[in-house]
Amino acid sequence: MSDKPAYLTRDGRARLEAELEELVTKGRKEIAERINAAKELGDISESGEYEDAKNQQAHLEGRIREIKSILARAQIIDEENGDNHEVRIGSRVTVRIDGEDGEETWTIVGSTEAKPSEGKISNESPIGSALLGKRPRQKVTVETPSGTMKLTIVDIQ
């Protein structure tokens, strides 16, 4: 697992803690019951149900380890104490994209919480990393997988 910080909002940390609690309590219990039920059917060496339950158990334990690692490295983004003079993790940034009408607003978050469809972009993404440290009215050129984008920062919250 990585040693680099995992940037999270308070809500993001709470969601991960709730997911971890659910996996450790309910998830482990359900899979243990499935494994025991498959064992009761007899020969487990050729049991598809047993093999499926063991695979799900491995997946569940992997997710538990992943969440624990993220929480251990968590650095909480203080969204209320925002500096609107430059883009940082936690900033809500409004940009104008050259060649397009209107504006886009994105929140810069850690990679764990990134959901572009919800306007949350990772600080590690091409756009997110290019915006970090920039100020209002500054122009930014970003190389993305789909080509070069030219942005103008309109507002930072």
From Swiss-Prot:
Keywords: Coiled coil, DNA-binding, Transcription, Transcription regulation. Residues 113-142 are annotated as: Disordered. Residues 13-75 form a coiled coil. GO terms for molecular function: DNA binding; RNA polymerase binding. It comes from the Bacteria. The keyword Coiled coil applies. GO terms for biological process: DNA-templated transcription elongation; regulation of DNA-templated transcription elongation. Belongs to the GreA/GreB family. Necessary for efficient RNA polymerase transcription elongation past template-encoded arresting sites. The arresting sites in DNA have the property of trapping a certain fraction of elongating RNA polymerases that pass through, resulting in locked ternary complexes. Cleavage of the nascent transcript by cleavage factors such as GreA or GreB allows the resumption of elongation from the new 3'terminus. GreA releases sequences of 2 to 3 nucleotides. PANTHER family: TRANSCRIPTION ELONGATION FACTOR GREA. This is Transcription elongation factor GreA. It comes from Roseiflexus sp. (strain RS-1). The gene is greA.
